[in-house]
Amino acid sequence: MVLTGQELLEYACGQFEGGAYETALRAFVLAYARNYEREWILENIYNCYMAGNEMEFRNSYGRWDFGEKTAYEKCMLDFIPYCEGEYYIYDREIQEFRGVFSVKTVESVVRQECFKQSEFSAMAAITDWNWSKMPEILSEAEYRKVYLVCKDKNRCDSFFKIPELEKFAKNIMIFSCKEEFQQYFHENTAEYLPKQCAGEEEERQGLLEIINQEHAYRLTPEGRNTERVLLTIGIPTYERGNLLLKRLENLRQMPYDAEIEFAISKNGTALYQEEYKSVSSIPDARINYKGYDETLTAWYNCKSVMQIAAGKFVLIVSDEDDVIISALEHYLKVLSSYTDLAMVRAKTCVQYSTIDRTMYYKKGKEALLGGFLGQNYMSGAIYHREKFWKSGVDVWDEKYYEDNSFYGFYPHAWCQVLLSDMGDYLEDNVCLISEGDSAYEDMKEQYSQTGNSLAENLKWDRNIPVYATWESRIEQHKDALECIHDFAGGDKELELKMLQRMLEKTVYLMINVKDKYELNEKKELANTFVDETLLRLDAFGMGLSEKSKDGIISQLLS
């Protein structure tokens, strides 16, 4: 049986008097739709359901300041509280109720897999005014910025009145047309371009075309903006201009611009110099290139990258290795989400392939021991640039770089120690680096042909790098104990843990190459190693038991 407007109104009044406010509102709206006593019904709905919530709506709308918006009083839509998280939409212009908007529907959306995989970048969509039709898009605004091109901006803006939408609304920006959308990104080149587009296929392709145009503009000197670079991909390169060009060929495929830069510090003067010269002619403003017409040490070349970088974080990558572009979405999300990070160690295909779970270590001893002596390979290390320079690295370089063999070979590994006092440390199990083949044999041959000699740290002995010989490892271990003692600053418990870790690491490294030595050589060097360790421990007021001493020698000789 279909009730008349009068019957519905009488029913609504009875329900309201009995405290069934939700049922009453449904009946009031139905009576209004029957064109019965519309003025009286609307006035009572506003008085009974809206008046007590007006200030909350106004405050919620006022908190949204992402772009230009319609004045509150001029918004065409009002929202009548119906039940928890649900509102009747009333259109003041056409004087009709236009359905129910449910916040619960937005909150209950199951995220699409494509949205999960695109963790960081903003999205864009062309839509009409009715947010009820796009819960999947709205729900994404909890995780990322969402740019809406709305054909009816006034009505679209009105939804910002709803208090429960605040966690979504804070990331939403609305444009009245595609031209306004493009103008915003053309003028605000520090804002990150959206990478995903939603909507009808033709409209989606139209947005993608605009985004591609603006991306191309941002690769020009005129369109380049470094104000909000989140990640610098830093490449300290040495005598391998041919490899650098391959690395850039890969990197330039990425869709990022304002988020990213490529900082390159060129080192060496002998090999592949023409290839290096060609880098400056590559038409990509993301490239920040500095060439030295001299030979720097590997560490100072790395620090040169840190000096020229603009990013909040700097990813160090060898000119032998490629960045896995598809993994950058994840790492950009990580770097933008964890505000206390000082360093990230990313998983790589070879050197750090055993990182099978993500581990987060808080600033201090936890961060120190979480990554201590695990940074021998530089590719995949991500440093917070400002914290790097505040960590005291220059002081340590001046004190130990020239005269301490451990620090001289592994200053990048010691950086993790220094940064543990500056912030948190993260090991992440998403693979970011694909290691390439070693360029050593090519460099060796090229140097031989040109009459140049290899740098000391690149020379080999017994078919292994000079720094990996037992003689060198013993010297490094002795010097490492000095660095540890200095850093611990009287904290005996911390010093003991670091010394134990260092001892285990050195023994492990020596065992790896023990087949390069005759038994008599091993015996002599093993005893020298233990004696040097004992001398240092005694000097620091610590000891090594005879059982431990015999155990170490046994491992090295077995």
Language-model features, listed with the residues they occupy:
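Short aromatic/hydrophobic "clamp" motif used to bind/position activated sugar donors
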Residues: 314
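Conserved donor NDP-sugar-binding/catalytic core segment of glycosyltransferases
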Residues: 326-359
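Acidic donor-binding segment of Leloir-type glycosyltransferases
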Residues: 250-291
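The conserved acidic donor/metal-binding loop of glycosyltransferases
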Residues: 318-322
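Conserved nucleotide-sugar donor-binding catalytic segment
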Residues: 365-464
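Short, well-formed alpha-helical segments that are part of the catalytic scaffolds
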Residues: 240-254
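Glycine-rich, basic loop-to-helix element that forms the pyrophosphate-binding segment
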Residues: 292-309
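C-terminal subregions of glycosyltransferases and related glycan-biosynthesis enzymes
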Residues: 2-7, 11-14, 20-37, 46, ...
